[in-house]
Amino acid sequence: MTMAQPRIRAVPTAATPEQPTVQLKGFTRRFGDNVVIDGLDLTIAPGEFVALLGASGSGKTTLLRTLAGLDPIGGQDVTTPDARAVVFQDARLLPWKKVWRNVALGLKDTNVRARAEAALKEVGLGHRLDAWPATLSGGEAQRTALARALVREPALLLLDEPFAALDALTRLKMHDLVLSLWREHKPAVLLVTHDVDEAIALADRVLVLDKGKIAVEERITLERPRQPDARFHAVRRRLLSRLGVEAPAPQPAPAPNSALLAFPTGEVVL
């Protein structure tokens, strides 16, 4: 879902390596006497994948809405690209429009169907162009939302807990798809999530937001695809500790003949 941007200073869609895609300097957001974001500094480089963790009420959604252009900024120093797109937890498809028309919303070219078809093929839904949204599974709906976002070639892709409502297997498949699309299209990405394992598996850098401030910044140097090995668990324990959650002890490796596979323990509810 592409957002208009009337109040935020924009940078060109193709940012240079020296020019960040996102930059906030001392950004503050209040609701009455409640300070939700408190003097926050944030920079996201072109093509960087950043994950944002934090307890409910820490300011994650407010920050994402600011970057999406949905909330006023009151003349503060916020820089984002013109080309932005958001994928929400709810796919937000229009039920009276077929799948390809949902993807093509807002496109003005004469070849909008061809562009929508290409985007849907890229997310594995080329066979569902003329389907109605009500017939899609949860995973298919989120794939459609991704296609709708990426068909516009955004310089900044904002992901607001897009996998939270999916079952575990579908979520893992969506992780692989998002990484593949990120490598292909090279947008800067900000993923808001409650799932520590998801953040470590996907991001170049993980931030923890606490009381409106960035309390933790962890650069993830593990090779992709990331496995739940000792190094993964070490990063996980550090992040959970800063989130005030006691990490469970790592599970022993399965016996050589065991049919069980070791996976991360999944979402941590904060």
Predicted features along the sequence, with ranges:
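Conserved ABC ATPase signature
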Residues: 132-136, 140
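Conserved beta-strand-loop-alpha-helix hinge in the C-terminal portion
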Residues: 211-238
